[in-house]
């Protein structure tokens, strides 16, 4: 399926993504089983979290927007990023929970670039998540125009 697409279009894919795909091809069944066990533990922890809280609110990204000429962040607060995707790990890591998540703009950096939050709710609570997001959007009332 996608392996065929990768083989036929490899020269058109960004080199970092090619490396990710090639690493994926080398993952063993045992490693996948271990990863699924870790993910199961994550589900249990998230479930416990939502016994006490209705929502998890966190930044959409670990860093402020950066120059368009910079392909990716190499360091955050003095800590080196091991891969080109570490700087937005908080964005994709939450998707591993299978919980509904929404991102909202909430303001602008000191240089005028947009910043946001993501809100996560327990599984199958999309209606509550959307209602809560609407309340936040109304309270924050970020200027609807683009800063660029």
Model-derived features: positions:
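Tryptophan-centric aromatic hotspots in well-structured domains and transmembrane helices
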Residues: 19, 43, 72, 87-88
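Short helix-loop capping/hinge segments that flank enzyme active sites or metal/cofactor-binding pockets
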Residues: 1-43, 47, 63-64, 103-106, ...
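Short, solvent-exposed amphipathic alpha-helical segments in soluble enzyme
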Residues: 41, 73-75, 134-135
């Amino acid at each position: 399926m996608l392996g065929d697409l990768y083989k036929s279009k490899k020269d058109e894919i960004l080199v970092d993504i090619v490396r990710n795909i090639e690493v994926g091809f080398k993952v063993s069944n045992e490693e996948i089983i271990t990863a699924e066990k870790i993910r199961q533990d994550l589900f249990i922890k998230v479930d416990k979290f939502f016994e006490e809280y209705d929502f998890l609110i966190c930044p959409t990204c670990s860093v402020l927007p950066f120059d368009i000429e910079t392909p990716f962040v190499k360091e955050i607060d003095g800590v080196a990023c091991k891969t080109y995707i570490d700087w937005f790990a908080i964005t994709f890591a939450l998707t591993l929970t299978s919980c509904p998540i929404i991102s909202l703009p909430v303001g602008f950096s000191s240089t005028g670039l947009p910043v946001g939050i993501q809100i996560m709710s327990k599984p199958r609570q999309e209606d509550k998540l959307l209602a809560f997001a609407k309340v936040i959007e109304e309270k924050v009332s970020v200027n609807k125009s683009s800063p660029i």
